[in-house]
């Protein structure tokens, strides 16, 4: 198989993939009205706090001041006190990066104040929402078989007022809530927001001043009716993974897409530490328990809602004792630097460069280089250009081998033409004679393909880096490129890509190519140009700069071998 055929196969595979995406877009659009008509979505505050119903919730391993670990029933038959019923006032907590609306039990709405929805707009991204069609909430509640627990509306803010804001010069906002149950049992819940941080600390203290032991367990869940995304080249949101992910020290990173959420059955697994999250393009939510905390990880459906949940720990609080449990709730962007500060093992995988570890590692390495270049150049577009230059330097030995292979192919092109003339339409004999010539002259027909094949994983990894990196969201390069994660609005870069591919094609020998392949090759620049018109402009920038440097190096290498580029162009034009 020669280099041209390899290139054609790769090109048509990419075209087929894009056609499949467009077909998926039409299919999703056709199914959307039916799905919307058949779903009835309850509001988050109408959902019962006692929804967990799994058995064998892990007992607490080490809870300060707590009595013996409790036993959670096989089915949750939670008793909520009459005093807990009703609707608690919605309280607003505001930091420099988050605005949360919550009732002490559920975070009903979360706005990301530093991330506008559109480039020129002022309305912030709303990650958690009470939208009637597609609600998305984070909830933390308590369940028990016999002991009283807070129900919907059970928690009340300790301080008067419904609005709490991080003041100027203040680094921490602490807002406590409390539920007062019967017979002296209470739960004090404290929300802590920090300046510049998207992880919300939530601490629960179960205080038992009654004369009897209290038994129960905490559950923390994310529930969402996912938005139906059209799968097409013009919708970059659909390129990114949308669904649930979780991480355990034992099994590592796993994920489940919304579109086939329960196809493999629900998740029901005991894990110590780890985290569970719901991902979308550029943003995510996650529950992060304590490292030594054992929880039951659960994926299930609650009507139209997809639910990702942690259950546990379960424990018994003796009379006169207090038990404490803590967790973090992340509501925010996939910012590498801030995720790293949380120091949670595996949490960096929410930046989903690939489900395959090796591709994810390549993506992380590329972003590391890209971010360091940005720290010097202060522009993500120029950082991409710098990354291309570095990659060309690193891959130069392979590129040199590719050009040498091309030079050999050009040298033997007249002899290949003679073989073509000798055997005419007998393709089998022609191919046999060609391979014998290559073997005799020690020519590797795949030598020019190897550098291309090695660069493909880098190209695909970089594609996901540019799609996934929220750091590049709405980041400008220069002039008409004001968002590197959006397509080129004027198609200038795709047009440059077509011109560069056409020029490169003219400088590349195509010995032994049949007329059909030659015609297909002539259309390749247009095919790739059409594809590049709908992908992120940052990726097209990479491809244009890479192709331009490749063209210059190829021109220079041809001259180094004593050949004239104009002669090669005329030969390929025949």
Curated annotation (Swiss-Prot):
GO terms for biological process: protein insertion into membrane; protein transport. The chain crosses the membrane at residues 6-26, 350-370, 376-396, 447-467, 491-511, 525-545. Keywords: Cell inner membrane, Cell membrane, Chaperone, Membrane, Protein transport, Transmembrane, Transmembrane helix, Transport. Disulfide bonds: none annotated. Its main location: membrane. It is a multi-pass membrane protein. It is found in: Cell inner membrane. One of its GO terms (molecular function) is membrane insertase activity. GO terms for cellular component: plasma membrane. It holds the Pfam family YidC_periplas. NCBIfam families: PRK01318.1-3 (NF002352), yidC_nterm (TIGR03593), yidC_oxa1_cterm (TIGR03592). PANTHER family: CYTOCHROME C OXIDASE ASSEMBLY PROTEIN COX18, MITOCHONDRIAL, OXA1. Belongs to the OXA1/ALB3/YidC family. Type 1 subfamily. Required for the insertion and/or proper folding and/or complex formation of integral membrane proteins into the membrane. Involved in integration of membrane proteins that insert both dependently and independently of the Sec translocase complex, as well as at least some lipoproteins. Aids folding of multispanning membrane proteins. Interacts with the Sec translocase complex via SecD. Specifically interacts with transmembrane segments of nascent integral membrane proteins during membrane integration. This is Membrane protein insertase YidC. It comes from Xanthomonas oryzae pv. oryzae (strain KACC10331 / KXO85). The gene is yidC.
